[in-house]
Amino acid sequence: MHKSLIKSQSAIVDEKDNLIKAFGNVSVKSNDGKKLLTDSLLWDNSSDKIFTEATLEFITSDTDTFYGKGFESNIDLTNWNILNPRGSINNE
């Protein structure tokens, strides 16, 4: 079973729309080692999707790190898309 842990400096829970808005040093860590770092994040609890329009760093392994602006994924970071990517992959 895939799981993720979200941490931030602050968050707003919108129970009506079933959303969580996280702000300030947001990190999402999946149990398989992926890590998303950004300044703001929206979690749609209805669809278990996360989104950000902010700049981000996404670490998929010890050697692969992607950077970009704009990100969407399922909550466990197994199906993700960086909207404006740039990156570094080490083939060692």
Q: Residue ranges of each PLM-predicted region?
A:
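Mature-chain termini and adjacent capping regions
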Residues: 1-92
